[in-house]
């Protein structure tokens, strides 16, 4: 059995990470910040400046904002949040936007009231919303987490200043307690009632948007094409539904997703494949619940080394967790689960993140293919030897090294990706 402190921390991590969000999380964060700033200002802004870190710009530039009438870009997210967002709804801040709000947003965008500036900051998730109306001004800063307001100033008066927080301390539960052995023990022994509500919400929400992605018109229709092109086997069903969910989300669908590590795509990738597998295999609900607990915590564990935003594609981490979760559901012992992780990370640790967009769905499909291959290799007793490439003696060490590559080694890559994305022909 786990120490009570570890048990409660893991429950806390799941509750903090597995929250509903509507649309891609970076534009939603901007909309939330703008809605909060407008609330402090107390009136409609006449001028707005959005100062954004490079990773915020990268992840907002190409993605459709939900409930916007298919608008894209930082200006649209900020202005829509300012005129029609409800900050009390957190990551669902745009869920109540109506036609009047969309119309007013377009009017203000036509007047070009919002300008965007690159914020030179060592913090990858960092932006400042500045608003002005008449003689009144507001500046609101968000850092580290998508709705973590660290500073608010109105008319030169500081209303809030909590910049002592970091990415690690802006949340309550202690993520440093995460490790593979305890994650497995927790998944095996957790009281189902302690996690049932959040797990069932993830199943319900993420499968709903998966089916919407299969039937609706979003992006390239990748889910349908996968289903129609390949044999109707387990992997095809997992890849098609998971990719469809991502494509719908990136394509502006207003249905909520239960996220993981601040990302809807990661929440989708670490859950939908397991749900499909469990239903196809007709496994009991409790087996799926425990596997989803395992997969979600394994995703968080990997991301604590990489950070919420980087040049490293988060679909790899979440798909790696999904593959390990399938091994867990298939009765694999911890040693076999570790082999699944190592086999995945030996294959696809080099996928870059070039921003949130509909092609994220294709990256998820490719990553799941690698993860399912890793699962089958491990279940057949096969794994790559330690020190094959970046692999270490233990899967936990390999996860740490991959995180080091993503967080430190790819910093210059991240800058170059942003430079290329911002080039104009």
What label would you give each PLM region?
Residues 37-40, 66, 277-290, 300-366, ...:
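Hydrophobic alpha-helical bundle architecture
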Residues 109-252, 417-425:
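Signature of multi-pass transmembrane helix bundles
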Residues 20-36, 255-272, 313-318:
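Conserved phosphate/anionic-ligand binding catalytic regions in large, soluble enzymes, centered on
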Residues 10-20, 56-65, 249-259, 299-309, ...:
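Glycine/charged-rich beta-loop-alpha catalytic/anionic-binding loops adjacent to active sites
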Residues 1-11, 44-58, 233-252, 285-302, ...:
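Acidic-glycine-rich active-site phosphate/pyrophosphate-binding loop
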Residues 2, 44-48, 89-94, 115-117, ...:
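Flexible, glycine/charged-enriched surface loops at secondary-structure junctions
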Residues 28-127, 131:
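Early transmembrane hairpin of solute transport permeases
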Residues 2, 21-25, 55-59, 63-66, ...:
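A structural signal for small-residue-enriched, beta-sheet-centric alpha/beta enzyme cores
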